[in-house]
Amino acid sequence: MILLLTGCSESKKLSTNQSEDNNQIKYKSKDITINENLLKENIKKISSNVRNYGSDGEIESSEYINNQLTKYGYSVMFQEFDVYKQDQYTTVQSETNLDYLNNNFYNSDSIGKARNIIATQRNFDKNKKTLYLTAHYDSTSDTIGIVDNASGSATLLELARVLSDYNDEFNIGIVFFSAEEYFRSGSRKFVSSLDEDEKNNILGCINIDMVGEKGKGPIIMQTVNGENNIMSIMMDKLTNKEFNLSGGGSSDDLSFYMGEIPVINLCNDYAKARLYDDAEDNIESIDFNQIKELCESILNAITDFKLSMYNKFLK
């Protein structure tokens, strides 16, 4: 299939045509405190070095993330993998899902090593379905990537902290991807490694990439084709914040989409509408209140997420 991807700035109001009962929802996450100081500390730690895939800086950041997740009570696994030659043809121009999920389409030699970070809750129940929260933690080779994507990684790490003891109708899966900046290699590896039973047991994915940058507009919600899916509908129904809907696919959300897993991507409205500049290396470019509010919105959705509602909208 050939994908037509639209930029972050082409957003529209989300309309689900559902009953107007949002105000009746109890937002249980209001009892959960998001720690802005931890958000700032995590961004600083993750972005302390350039983190292109396989680099010493990325390995150092992966160890920091691993240590934090372990401290929060998760069982953590590194998914080590080889990175192979990729290009636009094997990604956004892929003719089939299988071509996209072929990690070595050209049968080339490995051009590097990378590692995803997969965290499992201590109360994980294999008989329950799983909702994934994801972000990439690598950067390009010319930046420490405060915005892209220490911002998303720190958001995910804070969500992991407050959700560590979450125990309801489904599991929470936490994954930090490597090599997103090289044709989404990390998420392609993760999704392609899932068997059919594992994929069928996934409710969906919320991916976070480039959030909280000052002057880049509100946080918006993206789906690859710009149309509602079950995850965008649930997010809209279960938060106290209205998100504009836009076409996505420029981040790891594309890998889940190609794996036929419902996915949304959360980013600033104008996140991609710029060249890399000094803001990438400046912690002062981050609006931590915006990230805090995003964390609260995601928590609202998760803590009020009911399988009965999900299955109703899925029909």
Give each language-model segment a name.
Residues 35-44, 68-72, 107-175, 189:
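Catalytic-core environment of secreted peptidases
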Residues 4-7:
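C-terminal motif of bacterial Sec signal peptides marking the signal peptidase cleavage site
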Residues 25-33, 47-59, 104-108, 139-149, ...:
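Second-shell loop/turn segments in exported
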